[in-house]
């Protein structure tokens, strides 16, 4: 199975340019506008990230926290996010989309059900900001079996063991 994320990075490498990844929070402005915003920024992006808002986004900066708050206030639900992604992929089949968020929402939804829904919604990758190595091993394997890239975050303070 070909990874659209890998293909996007190969394409930009061959063009000798950095990849442009964009990010928007699902449900911020409205559910309908989220899809319009995602489609609009995808015209310039190699890869699009769609954040699923959380009520305690401790790993996010102020702007994303504010966006998440507005999205939750607007009534966005996880199934709405899958619907936004699915509609986006219907019109932008070759543009990779990555969902980014927190493990608590995945856990509450049910890991297996969440990953299956990602697959059915044509999600190319997942970033789960609060699921570090080695705790993410099983989740990562489940994603891989469904052809979904599990993307881990690394910072200057990340140990060599992680």
Give the residues covered by each predicted segment.
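Structural motif
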Residues: 43-45, 121
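Active-site-adjacent beta->alpha loops and helix N-cap segments on the catalytic face
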Residues: 2-12, 54-66, 73-86, 106-113, ...
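Catalytic cores of alpha/beta
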Residues: 30-42, 158-162
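N-terminal small/glycine-rich loop or linker at the start of catalytic domains
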Residues: 8-28, 61-67, 89-100
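N-terminal positively charged helical leader segments and presequences
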Residues: 5-13, 35, 40-43
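Conserved, mostly hydrophobic/aromatic
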Residues: 22, 41, 51, 118
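Hydrophobic faces of well-ordered beta-strands that scaffold small-molecule active sites
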Residues: 20-24, 48-50, 97-101, 126-128, ...
